[in-house]
Amino acid sequence: MILSRKWANDYVDLTDIDNKTFCDEMTLSGSKVEGYEVEGSDIENVVVGQVLSMEKHPDSDHLWVCQVSVGDDQPLQIVTGAQNLKPMDIVPVALVGATVINRKDHKLEKIKKGKLRGVASAGMLCSFDELGLTQNDFPYACADGIFVLGDDCDKTLGMDIHTAIG
């Protein structure tokens, strides 16, 4: 059986217990622990952001040009094809240089500054798949869109996403 630490934390406070100690204590209680893995541990430079505004892309009927705050003075312009967003949503933002998981081949990839149909994009808004997470830990999250952070997450803009989602 695979046990989510996030799920277990709903029943027992694991805040100050590292993974190895948790596994050792589970084994001492009579439960067999074969190992543990930290989902999304290869993900880097992804932070909490807020969608400030969304405009239709001038050259596409399915893309949006978003202004996104990550706590800095100037918002980032990010182009997305996600259809589940609205202004003021709090979302994971992969900054230029970030490492995320490619949804197609499940390999790590670096985010680069680029253009989508002629409009500059300085990052990427992330789904939970791209963060190496599953819907088991976030059942409220949209399976086919950007991961909009819920009330169980810290929503401090600019915070590392691993810290924010616990």
Where in this protein do the model-derived segments appear?
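Phosphate-backbone binding interfaces of nucleic-acid-interacting proteins
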Residues: 1-166
